[in-house]
């Protein structure tokens, strides 16, 4: 039986996780699961889930675990890259159980590290270019605060399991991508 494979991308909003996860998925034949993209799609389409999560996302808060896990289970593939999930220890533990149940091997957890002021600059520039109304400076700072509070504990969790790969997120996308491939050994 073929065992599934997974890579998790961690890092604050604006670190370039999505860009790098997309490239890795495309070049290596993985399916990229971006919970943010999936949720924004539901909001845009006005689905029942979208209506439930719209006010949560507008506040810059995290969407509840049960809703996220429901999405993940529906979207799981044999070779998958998680972008923006897990975001909490509870989600990480739930994902561990799900990967175990499905026989999916975790190849590594890539932590893309970028200084905070650079993150704010990147996110505000992206919001301007893409017309993303959920990204204004107040919301960006709130998202970074939520990240520090909820997601940074995952660094220790995955470090203790020996699967964390720290990658400098500064430089050109090609430079960062090369660091990620080297860190994962692929």
UniProtKB/Swiss-Prot annotation:
Major localization class: cytoplasm
Segments of this protein annotated with the region NMP: 34-63
Residue sites binding ATP per the record: 14-19, 126, 171
SUPFAM superfamilies xrefs: P-loop containing nucleoside triphosphate hydrolases
Keyword Kinase assigned: yes
Cellular component aspect of the GO annotation: cytoplasm
Classification via Pfam families: ADK
Region LID, residue ranges: 125-135
Alphabetically ordered keywords of this record: ATP-binding, Cytoplasm, Kinase, Nucleotide biosynthesis, Nucleotide-binding, Transferase
PANTHER family per UniProt: NUCLEOTIDE KINASE
UniProt-recorded name of the protein: Adenylate kinase
Annotated organism of origin: Thermus thermophilus (strain ATCC 27634 / DSM 579 / HB8)
